[in-house]
Structures are given as C-alpha cells and as structure tokens.
Amino acid sequence: MDSNKETKFSIQYGPKDILDKKFKNKVRGYDPDEVDEFLDGIIRDYEAFTNEIDRLKEENTKLFSRVDELTKQLSVSKNVSAQTPQTNAAATNYDILKRLSNLERHVFGSKLSDSSVDNHDDGNHSDVDQY
C-alpha cells in the first residue's frame, strides 16, 4: 500500500467561509442571530472534523512507516534464521566427527599398534578432516 495515497474530495466551504458568510435580510427572512448561532455550531463541528482528519492522516503515515520497518526487520530476521541452521548443522557435524575421532583415539589408541586393528583401520582419517 502506498502511504502517500490520499482520498481526494471536494470541499465547498471551509470554516472561515462559513464564518464570513453574510446573508441578505428579507422582510420575511430568518432571524439573523439564530442563523449565526447555528452556523457557529457548524464551524466548531467542521473544525473538529478537520482536526480529526489531520490527526488520522498523521497516524496513518506513522503506521505505514512502522509496517515498512517491521517488514524489513522480518525479512532480515528470515534471512539470518535461514542461514543460521545450515551453519550450525555443519559446525555440529564437524564437532561430532571430531569428538568421535578423539574418542576412538582414546579407546583404541593403545591398540592401534596391533596388527588386527591395523587390518581394519588404514589410519586415514581424511574423511574426518573434510567436515
């Protein structure tokens, strides 16, 4: 959504136009004081509506900015979380293989000189170093 998009509508009279409007007196016309009092009430309402519209436009702009900010944060967070498991999985596999290799050396270390173990283990641990 575009935060700069505003609904345009035609306003015929502003509060100042209503205040400054002078009516002609006719013989059988309305009481000018009553008309003025009524129009003063309309002016107050009109100004209140105008202030509320301005406040809502400002709030709308702030909310669109906040949505944009949160969308960017979410995008960054998704990118980081998508990369993190791959990195952690590779590191975890490497750590497991390293610990397994150390455990094998500890358990079978004294037997590595035996010929029976040498027949099954060629001493090549290059697959451990690959990870």
Swiss-Prot record:
Localization: Cytoplasm
Matches recorded under Pfam families: DivIVA (PF05103)
Statement: the UniProt record of this protein carries the keyword Cell membrane: no
Start and end residues of each stretch annotated as Disordered: 111-131
GO annotations of cellular component type: cytoplasm
InterPro entries associated with the record: Cell_cycle_GpsB (IPR011229), DivIVA_domain (IPR019933), DivIVA_fam (IPR007793)
Domain of life, per lineage: Bacteria
Keywords tagged on the record: Cell cycle, Cell division, Cell shape, Coiled coil, Cytoplasm
Compositional bias segments (type: Basic and acidic residues): 117-131
Chief place of localization: cytoplasm
One record GO biological process: cell division
UniProt feature coiled coil, ranges: 39-76
Function: Divisome component that associates with the complex late in its assembly, after the Z-ring is formed, and is dependent on DivIC and PBP2B for its recruitment to the divisome. Together with EzrA, is a key component of the system that regulates PBP1 localization during cell cycle progression. Its main role could be the removal of PBP1 from the cell pole after pole maturation is completed. Also contributes to the recruitment of PBP1 to the division complex. Not essential for septum formation.
NCBIfam families to which the protein is assigned, alphabetical: DivI1A_domain (TIGR03544), PRK14127.1 (NF010725)
HAMAP family the UniProt entry points to: GpsB
Similarity remark: Belongs to the GpsB family.
Subunit structure: Forms polymers through the coiled coil domains. Interacts with PBP1, MreC and EzrA.
Protein name: Cell cycle protein GpsB
High-level lineage: Bacteria, Bacillati, Bacillota, Bacilli, Lactobacillales
